[in-house]
Amino acid sequence: MALQQIVEPIVTGLGYALVEIERSAGGLLRVTIDLPWPAPNGAAAEPAPDGALALEPAPSGAGTLDTAPDGATALETVPSGATALETAPNGAVSTPAQSVTLEDCEKVTRQLQFALEVDGVQYQRLEVASPGIDRPLRGEQDLLRFAGSVIDITLKAPIGGAAAGKVGATRKKFRGTLERTASGGWQIVWSDAPPPKPGQRVGKKRLPAPLQALGFSLDEVRDMRLAPIVDFKGRTGKAGAAPAG
């Protein structure tokens, strides 16, 4: 049985949403969970219409639980700044991040350990975590949930002829604001203007670079995540939050 078929029913059956399953070096099996998100009134979670990429001017205007069979326990910091706790499969602890709590991770870990053992899944450590600041976006429900956020998107193939001379035809990576189109599809809107350097004064007469928009379908996307935007002046911005001003 595929790993997804084992893990997802356990996670959803406990009242959570499965975000991602990853296998890493050293036998680490990482399962990322989140609280389910109800679609707002009138926002049906349906696949966006298929369509070719189109580039055009835009209109103006984590708690982590890490378990190991050897019974060792170690507290460490994960890359996203959340806290990870390693324990044996027969005991589990976790810490809260975003809306998923330590108790949530503990509950899922206990059930997964049993299910993985029954199905003979090989792993050295099991880590149950909430999404970090670069949360992956997998489907239409995620797009509806994070519409208006700044995201990083990587296409499966270069933009090619859709670039229309406005960006490099070989470009595959974009960062911008996720928006719904009038036709019900999805687009990312951005400006290629370089940000001002620290201490640089921007003249009032300086015209802003025009916004551009790239329409896409999920089939054309290799990877899509919330942009990990951090304010180094001492305040950490919300993941994927659109810059103010």
UniProtKB/Swiss-Prot annotation:
Keywords: Cytoplasm, Ribosome biogenesis. Coiled coil: none annotated. The keyword Cytoplasm applies. It comes from the Bacteria. It is found in: Cytoplasm. Required for maturation of 30S ribosomal subunits. Belongs to the RimP family. This is Ribosome maturation factor RimP. It comes from Verminephrobacter eiseniae (strain EF01-2). The gene is rimP.
